């Protein structure tokens, strides 16, 4: 049975949700409902679908594209920041749902991909609800689960062994399959 849902890409899912809300209300744009009502309906619909999946026990992963944004610094210099290619309103909804808000990338050609989970420089927009998550991990599911469990354990130690979540996730073990046995099953 499946244990997670991967939304690839979140930008397209958000656009479809906006279109659905507009069609349901006979409008062209979410702003047409006035006083933020369209965005409220968008947030409610998005939360209902994806929080509903998490309440059913599924992990939900959102995949999106990056956007490079040049910002002016107070000293007159410019900095290029990396952020999700989402509208600010959509980004706010997604960030509010996310326990981990990371940035997957390669540091150099030929190297393993990494997942940046924290960035003190402010260049990469990312973050996490768990304060002991590492800045970066080699990107794979097992590393993510192990880092998350370690962060939860460290936080629990600070809080008289009270966990910040209801249950621990077991890191998956590598499964190997026998081709002939699988073919016999079919």
Predicted regions and their residues:
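Walker B beta-strand of ABC/ABC-like P-loop ATPase nucleotide-binding domains
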Residues: 5-6
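P-loop NTPase motor core
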Residues: 9-90
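Charged/polar, solvent-exposed surface patches and flexible loops
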Residues: 15, 19, 41-44, 48, ...
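Generic hydrophobic, helix-prone segments enriched in Leu/Val/Ile
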Residues: 17-18, 84, 90, 94, ...
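Noncatalytic linker/hinge segments flanking ATPase motor cores
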Residues: 45-55, 100-108, 141-147, 156-159
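Phosphate-binding/switch region of NTP-binding enzymes
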Residues: 60-136
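Interfaces that engage single-stranded nucleic acids at replication/repair/recombination sites
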Residues: 123-186
């Amino acid at each position: 049975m499946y244990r997670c849902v991967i939304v690839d890409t979140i930008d397209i899912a958000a656009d479809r949700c906006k279109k659905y809300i507009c069609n349901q209300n006979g409008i062209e744009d979410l702003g047409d409902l006035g006083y933020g009502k369209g965005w409220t309906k968008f947030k409610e619909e998005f939360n209902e679908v994806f929080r509903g999946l998490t309440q059913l026990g599924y992990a939900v992963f959102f995949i999106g594209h990056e956007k490079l944004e040049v910002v002016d610094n107070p000293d007159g210099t410019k900095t290029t920041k990396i952020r999700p290619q989402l509208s600010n309103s959509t980004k706010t909804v997604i960030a509010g749902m996310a326990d981990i808000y990371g940035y997957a990338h390669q540091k150099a050609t030929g190297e393993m991909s990494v997942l940046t989970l924290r960035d003190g420089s402010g260049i990469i927009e990312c973050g996490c609800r768990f304060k002991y998550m590492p800045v970066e991990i080699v990107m794979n599911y097992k590393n993510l689960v192990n880092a998350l469990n370690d962060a939860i354990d460290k936080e629990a130690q600070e809080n008289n062994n009270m966990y910040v979540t209801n249950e621990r996730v077991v890191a998956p073990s590598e499964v190997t399959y026998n081709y002939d046995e699988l073919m016999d099953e079919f």
